[in-house]
Every structure is written in structure tokens, then in C-alpha cells.
Amino acid sequence: MTPKARLLTEQRRRNVLDLVDQDGQVTVVDMVRRFSISAVTVRNDLDALASIGAVVRSHGGAVRRLEATQDYPLRTKEALHRDEKIKIGRAAAELVRPGETIILDSGTTTAEVARHLKRMRMQSLTVITNALNIAVELADIPGITLIMIGGLLRPVSCSFVGPQAEAMMNEFHADRLFLAVDGFDLENGLSTPDVLEAQLNNVMIRSAKEVNVVTDFSKLGRRSVSKIGPLDKIRRLITDNRATQEFTEALRKKGIEVIEV
């Protein structure tokens, strides 16, 4: 590449970064139109920016890099690691048996669990959730009894939290919990940006016979602000195959089953 071409490439990538910072995300289609370049060139730019940690590649584009300590809207999270979340959701749903009662925590990965359960058409299943988007997914599915946990609405996650939600959750027992987290640290356990969400998650853990954490590789080894609980309550982690061997082996040594998809 000539010095002039390199300069143009660097300037274009800086412009892409500015757009990501401004809008939260960019798409390949939009970048092709905006910069009058090929889709291949756009993908190369996004891959280069992702390789240095400046952005995170998403389906059809890239999004702003998220920090575990910050709380992001559901739509922003939905664009991240979508393929991995779909696979994780499928693997989690396949663990569920007819007649069970399960808890689905709020989150984009647990929403994928709900979508796969929807397609499975079980004859008898009870689902407890505090997430509006998950409730909408499952509300009219024959064979599914839906219990909605109410309380204080968190618009950023479309979920209910707070003392009322905790009190209601305390009234139930479940066979399995599927819990999505923002941080999964070997030393400090599970965590999330919001303290009220962390408190409700802790009640969910106590209410379930089996705790399954569903999260993609990007949350592993990270720590957020509000601690949910230690690792000793976790039966299983369902994640994608980009999780590091060091992390998964450390969990297995602690007696936690790891499913990688």
C-alpha cells in the first residue's frame, strides 16, 4: 500500500470510529454508501478496528465496544455476538423437559432461549420471567404457562426489578434458572451493572434447583459493579467456542459443567 493510500485508509477508519461513537453502531451497507467503497473494503476496515479493540463486530456491521460496568439498552446488546447467542439459546432450550418450571432472567441471550422454546412447542411448561420482551415472545404459545414478575420497570433492559419483584419471586420454586450476566469472574463470581437487578438475580438463584449461566465469551473474565453471587451455586455454563480453555478448565475444576457451542 502506498503512503497516500495508507493515509486515506487511516482517515476513513477514523471517520468510521467517529460514527460508531456518535451512533453506537454502523452497518456495512451504510458504510458502502457513505464512503463509496466496496463491502469487502468495509469489512476489512471493521475487522482491523475490531482487532485493536476499537469496536466489536456485529451481524452486518460493528458496534461500540461495551464496558461491563456500564448499562446498555437492549437493542444495543442485541446486535452483539448474535450468532453466538442463537447457538447458546438453542443449547440451553434443549436442556428443558416437558412439565418443568423454569426461570428466564432478562437479557438478550435468555431471549434466544425463549425463542427456541417457542419453536419446540412443548405440551407443558411453566416459565417465570421478569422480562417484558421474553413475556411477549411466549405469551400466546400453547402449552406454556407464563408467570410475569412485576415491580419497578428498568427501561434499559425492559425488565422488572425491586422489592416487589423480589417478594414475588420468593413465592416460587423452579427446576432450572437460565441466567444472563454482564460479568463472570473466577474470583468474584457473577455480576451486573444494576444493583436491583443483582438482588433479584440472587433471589432467582435461591429459588431454582439448578442454575445455568448463559453468556457469550465476551462476558467471561469480566467484572461489573453489582455482585450477584459466587460460583458455588452454578451447575452449568453454556457459552460459545470462543471461550478460553484456561477459563473453562478452571470452571470444570470447580465442578461446574461447561457446554461450548
Language model feature labels by segment:
Residues 113-116, 250:
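A short acidic, amphipathic alpha-helical/loop segment
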Residues 108-110:
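Gly/Ser/Thr-rich loops at beta-strand to alpha-helix junctions
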Residues 126-127, 176:
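A residue-level structural signature of the nucleotidyltransferase/glycosyltransferase Rossmann-like core
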Residues 2-31, 36-39, 51, 84, ...:
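Conserved phosphate- and dinucleotide-binding cores of soluble alpha/beta proteins
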Residues 2-29, 33-106, 115-122, 126, ...:
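HTH-adjacent hinge/linker in prokaryotic transcriptional regulators
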